[in-house]
């Protein structure tokens, strides 16, 4: 997993609440376990019409937001069914941080497990970020170490994050990476177990 320290990028305002995982990536795109190529399914029913043509007024289809790396979204983002493809699709599109007032628990966990940073801010700060991202300057800075978001106008917005999750994001550690940090202890345990319970070696 890639470490997340600081992100300076374009922010796209998605002024919709209760976006569920089926809207983030519909079920027809879940037939693969590959993480690459899922961007084509991201917000598919919002981005394309029944004939597969782009819907020009959807935010991520607008030229100024097509390269967005930060998504500013409405409350309760990522609700609905559990699908790890949701953060995969966002990341494959280039979005590495989602800012909202709240996230569904499973989606929130899946984000941290895959290196996508979910940032929770107050309704007032979200409204400010939404409004500013719709202006001529769409650039924001997300600093995980400092736990701040700097808005397009330069306002600094703080956010809270679990310290363990913060450390893992800063170091780029997923569950496997964290386990491998204890490789010496695991090897020692296996050596002792081989002596005390040799029948398990068969």
From Swiss-Prot:
GO terms for cellular component: 3-isopropylmalate dehydratase complex. Pathway: Amino-acid biosynthesis; L-leucine biosynthesis; L-leucine from 3-methyl-2-oxobutanoate: step 2/4. It catalyses: (2R,3S)-3-isopropylmalate = (2S)-2-isopropylmalate. Keywords: Amino-acid biosynthesis, Branched-chain amino acid biosynthesis, Leucine biosynthesis, Lyase. It comes from the Bacteria. Its EC number is 4.2.1.33. It holds the Pfam family Aconitase_C. GO terms for biological process: L-leucine biosynthetic process. Catalyzes the isomerization between 2-isopropylmalate and 3-isopropylmalate, via the formation of 2-isopropylmaleate. Belongs to the LeuD family. LeuD type 1 subfamily. Heterodimer of LeuC and LeuD. This is 3-isopropylmalate dehydratase small subunit.
């Amino acid at each position: 997993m890639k470490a997340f320290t600081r992100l300076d990028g374009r922010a796209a305002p998605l002024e919709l609440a209760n976006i569920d995982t089926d809207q983030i990536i519909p079920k027809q795109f879940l037939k693969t376990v590959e993480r690459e190529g899922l961007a084509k399914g991201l917000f598919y029913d919002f981005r394309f019409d029944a004939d597969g043509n782009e819907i020009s007024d959807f935010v991520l289809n607008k030229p100024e937001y097509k390269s967005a790396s930060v998504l500013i979204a409405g409350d309760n983002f990522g609700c609905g069914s559990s699908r790890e493809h949701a953060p995969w699709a966002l990341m494959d599109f280039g979005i590495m941080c989602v800012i909202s007032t709240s996230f569904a628990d499973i989606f929130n966990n899946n984000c941290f497990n895959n290196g996508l940073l979910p940032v929770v801010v107050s309704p007032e700060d979200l409204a400010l970020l939404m409004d500013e991202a719709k202006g001529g300057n769409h650039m924001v800075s997300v600093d995980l170490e400092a736990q701040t978001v700097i808005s397009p106008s330069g306002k600094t917005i703080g956010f809270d994050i679990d310290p363990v999750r913060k450390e893992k994001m800063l170091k780029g550690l997923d569950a496997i990476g964290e386990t491998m940090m204890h490789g010496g202890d695991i090897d020692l345990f296996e050596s002792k177990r081989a002596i005390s319970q040799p029948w398990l070696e068969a």
